[in-house]
């Protein structure tokens, strides 16, 4: 009985959450519909705790296109003539938390790894966000080889076209690089002046190492054929359910060279959803080998 009461209380609280004073009509059915659509389109699983986030972010789109309710917007979204709005819808619900040298322990491992490889070296950053991660990979490659023109090709992809545009520009507020060493700031960035005061731009040599392109990890076919020496898929899987995680990891396997490393986020464990990988170190994986041997990092 107590458990039933708790369940009813949770339902009551959720109902009240949807009945709060809001600019747009937003029902539990609308929220369920948003969850279903973003899961089908981008594989993102939204919990009940995301109601306010959904209202806020999708509400901005409703305001922009001049509609009056979530139902009207979602009907319009699904109509044949509005394919372009799917991109805006997906961008609105994508979270982009990132920084330069985030989860820093990965980059000395990457540096040692790529110094041993045949050239040229291919690296895939599968969730580029606003560019800090692929530029960090590029900086690591430059430092590993002692040149601004290392033998490295970096493919950086993301589902969100807005953040990809930011990444390709390579322009950031100065506080984004404030925690980098003075040496790195001087070597890899140019400080803005005049109208660009307070901004920094990634040096062209770094940007030339990276090819940015839109890619949905949920797509059946990826526009990528050649295998990689390293793949970064960090803090992405936490937004997907386990079947989706397993599907994506299985598609990584043929894109990994025999010696390739796969880097995960700090709260992600790929061993639960893949039988093709083995753990090398803290959130660093490689393909399983027939002899059962494991490299030392």
Tell where the protein language model's regions lie, with residue ranges.
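Conserved AdoMet
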Residues: 2-124, 265
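Short conserved AdoMet
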Residues: 118, 172, 257
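Conserved class I S-adenosyl-L-methionine
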Residues: 120-133, 153-155
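Conserved SAM-binding loop of SAM-dependent methyltransferases across substrates and taxa
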Residues: 130-147
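Extended basic-aromatic, gly/pro-enriched interface segments that bind polyanionic ligands
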Residues: 147-232, 236-244, 269-271, 291-294
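A short glycine-rich, Lys/Arg-flanked "PGG" loop and its adjoining helix->strand segment in the class I
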Residues: 246-258
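Conserved beta-strand signature within the Rossmann-like core of class I S-adenosyl-L-methionine
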Residues: 259-266
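Class I S-adenosyl-L-methionine
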Residues: 268-297
């Amino acid at each position: 009985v107590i458990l039933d009461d708790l369940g009813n209380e949770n339902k009551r609280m959720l109902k009240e959450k949807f009945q709060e004073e809001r600019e747009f009509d937003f029902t539990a059915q609308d929220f369920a519909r948003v969850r279903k659509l973003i899961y089908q389109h981008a594989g993102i699983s939204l919990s009940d705790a995301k109601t306010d986030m959904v209202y806020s972010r999708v509400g901005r789109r409703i305001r922009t296109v001049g509609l009056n309710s979530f139902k009207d917007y979602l009907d319009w979204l699904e109509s044949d003539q509005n394919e372009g709005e799917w991109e805006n819808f997906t961008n609105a619900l994508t979270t982009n938390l990132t920084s330069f040298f985030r989860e820093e322990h990965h980059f000395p491992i990457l540096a040692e790894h790529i110094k041993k490889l045949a050239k040229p070296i291919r690296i895939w950053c599968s969730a580029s966000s606003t560019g800090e991660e692929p530029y960090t990979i590029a900086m690591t490659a430059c430092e590993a080889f002692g040149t601004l023109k290392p033998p490295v090709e970096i493919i950086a992809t993301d589902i969100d076209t807005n953040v990809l545009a930011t990444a390709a520009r390579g322009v950031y507020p100065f506080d984004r690089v404030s925690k980098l060493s003075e040496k790195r700031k001087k070597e890899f960035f140019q400080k803005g002046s005049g109208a660009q005061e307070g901004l920094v731009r990634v040096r062209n040599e770094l940007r030339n190492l990276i090819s940015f392109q839109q890619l949905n990890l949920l797509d059946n076919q990826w526009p990528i054929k050649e295998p990689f020496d390293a793949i970064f898929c960090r803090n992405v899987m936490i937004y997907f359910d386990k079947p989706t995680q397993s599907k994506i990891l299985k598609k990584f396997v043929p894109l990994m060279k025999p010696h390739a490393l796969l880097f995960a986020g700090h709260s992600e464990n790929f061993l639960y959803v893949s039988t093709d990988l083995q753990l090398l170190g803290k959130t660093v994986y490689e393909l399983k080998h027939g002899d059962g041997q494991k490299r030392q990092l």
